Structures are given as C-alpha cells and as structure tokens.
Amino acid sequence: DFMEMVGKRLEKCPMEIRYAYQEQTKMLPEGMTVPPERGAKPWGTSHAVLCAKNEIDGAPFAVINADDYYGKEAFKVIFDQLSASEDPYGYCMVGYELGKTVTENGSVARGICEINAEGFLDVVTERTRIEQYEGGIHFTEDGGESWTEVAPETIVSMNMWGFMPSFLQEIKDRFSAYLDEYLPKNPLKCEYFLPLPISQLIAEKKATVKVLSSSDRWYGVTYAADKPVVVAALKNMTAEGKYPDGLWG
C-alpha cells in the first residue's frame, strides 16, 4: 500500500503534498477509448505527468523516477535553474554519464543525449537495451542481432527533468496525435514517453533544454542483484553524515 509505505513518511516532512493518479481514462482526448485488449497498461511517462496537471497548478516543476536516487546536488541545480528562468519554454534536465548508470546484472534502458556546444539538448533517443560487457558498453535495436558501441562518458537522461507550465499544455495537445499514429500500430504496448514531445519541441525550435550536471552519483535498482550495492551506498552516505540516521524520524 503506497500510503502505508511512503505517504505516512512524507507527511512528517514540512511541505505540502498532493497526490495525482495515473488512470487510463484520465486526460484521454475526446472521443478516444481504451482498447479492451490493452488491459491495465498505462500510457507512459508523458501521460503520467499530464495526469498531475491540475495538482501542479501553473508553477515550474521537476519530474523524477520515484524509485531512483539522484543525489542532493541534482535537486539544487534543477531548482536554481527553474527559479532563475524567465523563458516560458526554457526547460532543463540533469544528465549523468552512461558508464555510471549501467549494471553488470543485465540490460538497461536509457535516454541517449546529443548536446550542442552551448550545453543545450539537441536530441534524446530512448535505447531500451543497453548492456555493459568486458570491452565496454553497447546497445542493440534488433534483439541482439547487431550491436552499436557507445562511450561510457556519453550523457544520458535518467528522467530528471525541469519544466515550465507550458510543457503541460504541449503534451496535452500532442497526446491525440500520438495516439492516432501509434495506437493502431501497437494497441497493447504503445507508451507516450517523455523524450518524444521533448524532441519534437526542440526540433520545432519551440523549446530549449539546458543540460545540467551534478557531482552526485545516480543509483537505482533495475535487478534484484543491484539492491546490495544501493543499500551499501546509502549506508555509507549516512555514515558520512550526508543523511540522518533514521531519515524519517
């Protein structure tokens, strides 16, 4: 139960908490219905953000994966960037080096970033099967028939984004076109991922995404075998005084 595991702990923090629920029929374009054969599968990360539109209430906002550790500095740099921005289409993201986000326990999905000389995102491409091997890191798009090498220092998105309120209207306006194109092709599994509308807005020169960096390391549990590494890292940070012993009191 989410409230038992997370909600009650968050209530101890000195901040306002609002809950938004990603439901299949929520924010669906008028006249659109959920194919019965799709089951309960959600519509993806863009739709998840869209479902929080009313709770965000017209303010700049950040998006993260709830089960990832990004480090304290990452939150500071994204807050500072959003607070200082006066551009209604000036977005941002925190990038991490690919080599510091892979696991030896299996493949991972990452958003590979192409960044221009001014430090802004040109393209983010979702690679759903990236693997670390003895000679380096590579990805495949054809089930392992062929592989493409990728440098460990390549910057990737770990889904830590900073947006202005304009983004909510953009993903709402583009959701219908996405469903018109992709739902007939893949009614069971198509998902409206964040990199798609972001890449569209950049290509249209309608928005910019500043790529921020953090000295903190990202941690996540993709496989059960990753958990001991993350647990040890968090214990070390607690021992170093970065976090209190007994985080939730």
Spell out what each predicted region is:
Residues 29-40, 106-112, 225-229:
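Short, surface-exposed amphipathic charged segments that create phosphate/polyanion-binding patches used
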Residues 20, 62-65, 93-97, 213:
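Short beta-strand segments
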Residues 155, 210-216:
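Catalytic beta-strand/loop signature of glycosyltransferases that borders the donor
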Residues 1-65, 70-71, 75, 84:
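Conserved N-terminal catalytic core of the sugar/cofactor nucleotidyltransferase
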Residues 226-249:
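Generic C-terminus detector
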Residues 160-172:
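Conserved nucleotide-sugar donor-binding
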Residues 172-207:
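A C-terminal functional module that forms or caps the active site or interfaces directly
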Residues 71-160:
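Conserved core of the sugar-phosphate nucleotidyltransferase
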